[in-house]
Amino acid sequence: MHPKPTAAQNLPDRRDFLRRVVVGGMLAAAAGPAAGAGEARAPASPSADDRAYWLRMMRRVCEPVLSHLATGTLRAQMPVEAPAAAADRPRSDFSHLEAFGRTVAGAAPWLELEEPEGAEAADRARWRELVHRALNQATNPASPDCLNFSRGGQPLVDAAFLAYGLLLARKSLWDPLPAEVKARLLAALRSTRDVAPPNNNWLLFPAMIETFFAVAGTSWREDVVDRAVRAHEAWYQGDGTYGDGPEFHWDYYNSYVIHPFLETILRELRGRTDRWASLLPRVLRRAGRYAAVQERLVGPDGTFPPLGRSLAYRCGAFHHLAHQAFRDALPPAVTPGQARSGLAAVMRRTLEPEGTFDADGWLRVGLAGHQPSLAEPYISTGSLYLCALVFQPLGLPAAHRFWCDGSADWTQRRIWSGADLPPDQALKGD
């Protein structure tokens, strides 16, 4: 049970807030997506336009989720597209928390950025307020948008994505919350402890939540984290790749979840316990190798192999490469200009095709346009917002090398253009 709420503190009038949200969102999105969806683009000289494109796409993807939940209208306004053969219960029970948790995890690094001047600063302040209000709505039993954290297994996944986002933006999203909202949110996250995760990447979801508890200064279960860390160590297949459970699968779950979650958990708990200190250097070396592999998966035109499940996560397949860029931890073979250009090419191929968004700006199922047959039974509209994780490099300042270095062809584009490059090298011994 959540604690009984009282009136939220220090929250402006709802009608005035909604008016500011709508007007601000319209102005931010006015430029719309770049034209020429699906074209192969030649790298351009570095300019403010590179970052502006990423910001524009982040606003287009994330603004509807945050603005509607902040004002208690997410359930009323977000459609829930799901396969006819959806799993054991309606996806509408889960889809809204999916959308929120994944959106916050993608936007969090940018929201934590401390650059007090300029147009981005004003947008960041507005979005921080949106997330604060959304967290209040999501955990308030009196809200029409009180989200499901405790019924079924799926909420464990997206509570973990929300915890991940709060870890990446603790100063801007968690610390300023009123004590009442913090208490409700902690109770909601604790309610996921009743879910028994399957023996695969799901072990990282309760581990991420327990890590957040540790960082938030409340009681946490070290054994839950240890189980996830030890299991993935046992499932390591070599050359930077983990099994999703004991067996290997051709899919993008090393990027969707495994590498970014495992690295974040170990980074955040470093200094709180030395239990896994010896593992972190190995985990980081593997993460570097997998980032190099991901960069090589980007085709000359920004496409990538449509392998495995959850392809409707679109450019979220490159969460790990984006996360390594945000961490300033790209491998030596991948320059910031390569990573920025390659990720932007993937974004264009997966977010710009006709049919990607509905008339009201909500994502639709597909990889390149509207392709509902690609959806597994667990996919619904909220699931699709995992694509937002590609925006994590926006957490780097505008003056960082990632944004200022010259644009560069990524590996496949160079090789298929005839460039003479050294061979790829496997990671051995880790």
Which role fits each region the language model picked out?
Residues 248-363, 375-398:
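Long, repeat-rich segments with strong aromatic
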Residues 49-76, 119-133, 171-179, 214-233, ...:
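An acidic intrinsically disordered interaction segment
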Residues 1-16, 23, 29, 39:
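N-terminal secretory signal peptides
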Residues 23-27, 39-98, 105, 109, ...:
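Low-complexity, Ser/Thr/Pro/Gly-enriched N-terminal "stalk/linker" regions
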Residues 107-109, 124-284, 296-319:
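Aromatic-lined, polymer-binding surfaces characteristic
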